């Protein structure tokens, strides 16, 4: 049985890492050992940040809704409670969009929430 030389597989493995490290600065793009570490770390950041992105967008939506409700004389928590009591099921993403781009429609929602809280 002939001995297996690793030239082809090693080169393929290195090329795969270098392709992933394309665009990196310094030795991170052309030294295999450093590039491999950089790609691994990038993968960890990507994994973590895919989860953080969901949290950050929810925070952004809440900030925008809060700003819109305070313009109409209500706090965020009371507004959300009012919507729940009024049986209005609109998610925060859509509410934030309304608060920024359609202030009239958002003001009507705030009035409905106020009415539901008063009742």
Curated annotation (Swiss-Prot):
Single GO cellular component annotation? Answer: cytosolic large ribosomal subunit
Could you tell me which PROSITE patterns the record lists for this protein?
RIBOSOMAL_L20
Cited Pfam families: Ribosomal_L20 (PF00453)
Q: Name one GO biological process term.
A: translation
Top-level taxon of the source organism: Bacteria
InterPro entries, A to Z: Ribosomal_bL20, RIBOSOMAL_L20_CS, Ribosomal_protein_bL20_C
Under Gene Ontology molecular function, one entry of this record is: structural constituent of ribosome
Keyword list, A-Z: Ribonucleoprotein, Ribosomal protein, RNA-binding, rRNA-binding
Q: What does this protein do?
A: Binds directly to 23S ribosomal RNA and is necessary for the in vitro assembly process of the 50S ribosomal subunit. It is not involved in the protein synthesizing functions of that subunit.
Family per record = Belongs to the bacterial ribosomal protein bL20 family.
Protein known as: Large ribosomal subunit protein bL20
